[in-house]
Design a protein with these regions (language model features):
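Short amphipathic alpha-helical surface micro-motifs
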Residues: 40-45, 67-70, 90-92, 100-102, ...
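A short, polar/proline- and glycine-enriched secondary-structure boundary/capping micro-motif
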Residues: 105-112, 128-134, 165-171
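Short, solvent-exposed aromatic-acidic interface loops
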Residues: 99-106, 122-127, 158-165
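An anionic, turn-rich surface loop/hairpin at beta-sheet edges
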Residues: 71-84, 119-145
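A structural detector for beta-sheet-dominated domains
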Residues: 64, 89-91, 110-112, 120-122, ...
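Edge beta-strand at a domain terminus
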Residues: 33, 38-43, 134-176
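Mid-length scaffold segments of soluble, non-membrane domains
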Residues: 53-118
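Amphipathic/hydrophobic helical signal segments and adjacent flexible N-terminal regions
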Residues: 1-56
């Protein structure tokens, strides 16, 4: 199986490289729009340097999406969605699938370093049943870091997503 460095698009390589800038800029914008209390209540989930290392195991997860910062005027600077169902399963590589919702990320999780893994995937919209292959439609490509941030708690940090927000964070908690 190829490494993530062999698969990633040049645009997503920049997103991954500049993740921290996107994270802090999104937080600044949301705080300026009076969302400090909501941000603080999330604890490690919305702290840029909260990664503590440890790969995410396969299984079913509750996935809660938080969109931080607005790409353009008129959009909300902070939105939290209720938990959706997600699954991580092993094939030739670890595969992440958001199983429900109107915007569903689907893709592969690659080893990266001691603190995190890389997610490269695509966005499935609405009632679509098939995902585009990563790298074929830049408007659908998604890239991010998967990080453990606590006991049985991970996050997927998606810097500079194509639509709506400056940063998407998906909280991943194993289903009991």
């Amino acid at each position: 199986m190829p490494t993530w460095q062999e698969v990633v698009t040049s645009e997503d390589r920049v997103r991954l490289r500049d993740w921290r800038t996107a994270f802090t800029r999104a937080l600044e914008q949301s705080r300026a729009a009076n969302h400090s209390a909501e941000i603080e209540s999330e604890g490690a989930l919305l702290e840029p340097d909260a990664a503590i290392g440890g790969p995410i195991p396969n299984g079913d997860y509750r996935c809660r999406v938080i969109k931080v910062g607005a790409k353009s005027q008129g959009l909300l600077e902070y939105v939290t969605y209720p938990a959706f169902r997600c699954r991580i399963e092993q094939g030739q590589a670890q595969r992440f699938t958001k199983l429900s919702g109107s915007q569903r990320q689907v893709g592969l999780i690659y080893p990266a370093d001691q603190l995190r893994q890389v997610f490269l995937g695509t966005l499935v919209l609405g009632d679509e049943t098939q995902a585009y292959k990563y790298g074929t439609d830049g408007d659908r490509d998604v890239a991010g870091w998967v990080e453990r941030i606590g006991d049985n708690r991970w996050r997927m940090v998606l810097p500079s997503p194509r639509y709506e927000s400056l940063l998407d964070v998906i909280e991943l908690v194993p289903e009991q």
